[in-house]
Structures are given as C-alpha cells and as structure tokens.
C-alpha cells in the first residue's frame, strides 16, 4: 500500500517539475519573441492542490496574468491511467497540449508536445491606428477641405468687389467742392495736399486762399497762398510739408515750412476757404479701417433690407393687424348676433320633457282600468269606485244657507 501511494505522488511531483520547466521555457520565449511598443509584465500565480474525494484526482492550478487579460489557464487532471495538461489562452493564441503517462516514471521517456503562443509585433497599420487623430494630417482632414472650398467662394469675391466699390464711392463722396477747385488728395503720411482744377477751360484764382485743417470743428493749422496765384484749367497745385524736403516751384508746388506734416487722420477735415472764410472745398481721408466699417454696415444694411419685408409685417404690420383684428372682433359680434342670439332664445323656450308620477299605472288607484290588476276587480265595483272617486275629486259648490224665516214661509204656503 505504501508503494502504491508513493508512485502517484512521485508522478505528480515529476509532472509539477515538468510543468515548471515548460512554463519557464514559455516565459523565456515570450521575453525573446515579444516586440511591443510598451512593456507588459506578466506574473504566474500557483494555487494549492485540490483533492477530489471520488476519483482521487490531484488538480494543481496555475494562472498567468497580464495587464489586460489572462493569457492561459492550466489544469492538470491525474487519473489512474493518464494525466493531461491543457491550457486555455487568448482567442488568437493556440492551445498548448502536454500529455504524460503514469507508466513511464522517468522524465526522458515522457512524450511532450507543446506549442507556445508568441506575440507578434504590431504591423504598420496598427501603429498608424495609434497615431491617427494626432498631428497636422488629422487637422487638415477636418478643416483642409473646408478651407479649399471656402477659399474662393462667391461670397468672398462679392465682399472684395464691394470693398473696392466702397473705396471708390467713399473717395468721391468724401472730397466735395462748391466750385471748380477740389482737394484731390491728402497724403496718408502727411507729406502734401494736392488741389485740382476740374474745369477744362476756366482758370481759377486761388491767391490769398486759406488751406486749413479742422479737428472736431476747430482749426489746427492754416496755410495762406501768396497773392496773384492762378490755377490753370485741368492743372494741379501741391502744398508740401516741411518733412517732405521738397523744393518750392510756384505756381504748381509750394512748401509749408512751418508745418512739418499734415494731419491725415479720419477725424481731420482739410478745407479750402476763400479769403473771407467761405469754404469752397473739403476733404476727409478714408482708411482701410473705415472702409471695413462701412463694408460691415453695408452688409448689415443688406441683411436688414432682405429681412425688412418680413420684419415690416412683424414690426409694423402687427399694429395694423391688431387694429384690424380688434375691428373684426368688434364687427363679428354685430354680424353674428342674430345667429348666436336666436339659438339661445330657442333653447330658453324649449320645455324639457318631464315625467309626472301620477301618469304611471302603478301610482293610480287599482280600481281604475289602466292599472295592471284592474281586470281582477269587478267592473261594477270599479264603476262605483270611479263614480265615488269622481264625486270625491269634483269640487262641490258651496250654497248659501237660507234664513230660517224664509223656510217657514215656504212650508206654510
């Protein structure tokens, strides 16, 4: 008995040793064969043996854990004839099968066949899946096409065309004059102011005329032309500032040595006045900022003009609509009073049907004919009863009582 018990224990120990060697070989091969972007640590935990009372089965369990899910579950089942080691791994990995026999006690004679699962390195497509969604390509995939589509839209072209038209219109409307002389240009850098005679045949005298710049209605600089200066037809005259370092060439070019630069800000208005102070030409510069502001206002105006027809119905039409609705409400009762009042009057005149309790046959006298039991009663009795009932129901007129003296007289006669 002792020998028989020692033999299965020796076989179990040999199986455990072989299992540990196989697992060590698997771990080494996994360390050599695994090529992953991040390290994954695995540990093998051994659980105590479980004795089966019925078949004397020894089940040593071992389980390997990784970062995400268990790689394998090993179970050894030993019986009297044979013992099998099976492993259940991941779905993608192949199962490892190791078979041993109790008849051969030596480890050399035992036949083992095992297939160790190896982790294959990730392909380039898998690596791309990790990096997809980051970087410039992802941004361009989201917004690149939209930029291409919106780069040359008709709306942008319309805006640019509208801006150029605004600049042209603003240039015409900001430079105004009462006569032939106009202020054609005020240099943005403030180096000069140019006047032009728009007449094709007429010469204009500008001697002693005053060129001034006003800010908020107050003159900040004044320049007076010399005497006897005549501006030829379709000709220009330029007044240079000292910062321009230009040379005076009358009657076409003049230098204002006391003024380093002209003002070119939008809040400054350049005015040409007669010697008596009467303004004959004025100019207000325009910049990109003002142009964009005007463009925005024009766009808003266009939007409002598009919405105005419907907005008028809502903003202005609601007053008339409310007035008309109130009028209709006032008129409707007047028009509909006949149709609404008459049914009410008819309903008041209608008398609802009422059930009188005295009409019920059960509520009448049983001697009367309509009563259900009237046939059981003698007709003679019924006639008597009816006559007596009628006499009882008929009101008897009250006769005045005669005087006793009158009765006696009648009796004697």
Curated annotation (Swiss-Prot):
Database matches in InterPro entries: Lamin_tail_dom, Lamin_tail_dom_sf, LMNTD1
PROSITE patterns associated with the record: LTD
Polar residues composition bias: residue spans: 107-128
Positions of disulphide bridges: none
Residues in LTD domain copies: 169-287
Entry's transmembrane regions: none
Pfam family, one: LTD
Swiss-Prot/TrEMBL keywords: Intermediate filament
Biased composition, class Low complexity, residue ranges: 385-396
Family designation: Belongs to the intermediate filament family.
Identification of the protein by name: Lamin tail domain-containing protein 1
Signal peptide feature range: none
Entry's Gene Ontology BP terms: cell population proliferation
Positions of region (Disordered): 1-25, 102-128, 356-413
Any one annotated GO CC term: intermediate filament
Organism of provenance: Mus musculus (Mouse)
